[in-house]
Amino acid sequence: DLIVTGVQTCALPILLKAHIGKNLFATTDPCVAASQDVVVFVTGTPVDEHLNPRVNDVLKVISSYIKHMNKDQLVVLRSTIFPGVTQIVENLLASALGSCKLAFCPERIVQGKGIEEIFNLPQIVSATTDAAFQEASALFSAIALKVIPLSTTEAELAKLMTNAWRYLEFAIANQFYMIVEKQGFDFYKILSAMKDDYPRAKHFASAGLAAGPCLFKDTMQLSAFHSNEFFLGHSAMLVNEGLPNFLVQQLEAKMGCLKGR
């Protein structure tokens, strides 16, 4: 319950009321996959204690559904996966089903704006076969603003790079925040002056906690893909994951010892 009570868009209650029990159903029964034309997996790839991707977590979920699937279905992967995993999933499905139609079409929406953005953002579409690409393109052309074709590995990298880029953006803002606040100045006053009618600073991020479910792990996955030589990503990790400790130190400087408070 704590997970599913997250941010809701304003249109969500209206849409749920209109569709639940009619053309929208929720179930934990994997058998329902057998009767579907399209099966979409939204299992993200976590990282382990060594910051390496746990690819088997994704494969285990897909494997648990295979006995309910068939070769005529379009299978779509939506969540972040390590580069090359789409091909591994294709081999897994083909081995069990004889052949498959597999696409990787990464979701690009931001939390709290899902309904708005799924219609207004372009959708990257990649697939392991022409038939799968055509079906996936038709599916998302009915929803998204436009379809952008990539190879599966290009699409996997695009998803990781997008999230790593955002993580780096937040790290820059957080580093500046710590530099300024440590010296007793107001970061947001300075940031406001920087952005005031100055187009090149228009998209400068605000400081803030950047852990979340995606950005950190996807930055580390990109690093793992590059033999752990993504030095900007590692520096961003030190900044972003170090911000909570900085905030506690700032509180202690103002309030004294926080033990027991």
Residue ranges, per PLM feature:
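Structural/interface elements that position substrates and couple domains in central-metabolism enzymes
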Residues: 11-261
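Single conserved hydrophobic/aromatic residue that forms the stacking wall/gate
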Residues: 1-10
